[in-house]
Amino acid sequence: MLKYLVQRRFTSTFYELFPKTFPKKLPIWTIDQSRLRKEYRQLQAQHHPDMAQQGSEQSSTLNQAYHTLKDPLRRSQYMLKLLRNIDLTQEQTSNEVTTSDPQLLLKVLDIHDELSQMDDEAGVKLLEKQNKERIQDIEAQLGQCYNDKDYAAAVKLTVELKYWYNLAKAFKDWAPGKQLEMNH
């Protein structure tokens, strides 16, 4: 099955590669992560390059699909590309959305600046906790957007999620006095 889907990759979706997790083969937001991981491991055991001929391409496609679907940001970007042909992985598209909400960028930059000036771990942990809560809130809102087919709101939330994910990376890189880079 996987071999067939990989060979006709141009018509298949990542959801089709995991028929037990997604029996309807339709893009959905809410995912049973443990079921996805279990099915991924089973398929990987069958199609790993060491186990099957032509396994390298199949394994690579399977890896890409799994990592896209398990990560909320990448999943949302993928769903928007699939459902509305909006590619938020392209910087220009993402920037167009950001310019429509300059307050978002200012808020992210303010928090990033505050983080770079911090010298105590307790303050950083508090900011990091607040950022994790923002991310969880946006992920919940995205679920509602996809259920309601409100793709315009999903676009804005996905761009916002990308900024908060990048800020989460800055928390991991933080050390007192260390210069932090801000990616967007």
Swiss-Prot record:
InterPro entries: DnaJ_domain (IPR001623), HscB (IPR004640), HscB_C_sf (IPR036386), HscB_oligo_C (IPR009073), J_dom_sf (IPR036869). Residues 1-10 form a transit peptide. CDD domains: DnaJ. GO terms for biological process: [2Fe-2S] cluster assembly; [4Fe-4S] cluster assembly; aerobic respiration; intracellular iron ion homeostasis; iron-sulfur cluster assembly; protein complex oligomerization. One of its GO terms (cellular component) is mitochondrial matrix. It is found in: Mitochondrion matrix. Changing residue 50 to A: Decreases JAC1 ATPase activator activity. Decreases vegetative cell population growth. Sensitive to high temperature. PROSITE patterns: DNAJ_2. Residues 71-184 are annotated as: Interaction with ISU1. Keywords: Chaperone, Mitochondrion, Stress response, Transit peptide. It holds the Pfam family HSCB_C. Disruption phenotype: Increases association between GRX5 and SSQ1. Inviable vegetative cell population growth. One of its GO terms (molecular function) is protein-folding chaperone binding. A motif (HSP70 binding) lies at residues 48-50. Interacts with ISU1 and SSQ1. Co-chaperone required for the assembly of iron-sulfur (Fe/S) clusters in mitochondria. Stimulates the ATPase activity of its specialized Hsp70 chaperone partner SSQ1, to mediate the transfer of iron-sulfur clusters from ISU1 to GRX5. Binds to the substrate protein ISU1 and targets it to SSQ1. Present with 2010 molecules/cell in log phase SD medium. Belongs to the HscB family. This is J-type co-chaperone JAC1, mitochondrial. It comes from Saccharomyces cerevisiae (strain ATCC 204508 / S288c) (Baker's yeast). The lineage of its organism: Eukaryota, Fungi, Dikarya, Ascomycota, Saccharomycotina. The gene is JAC1.
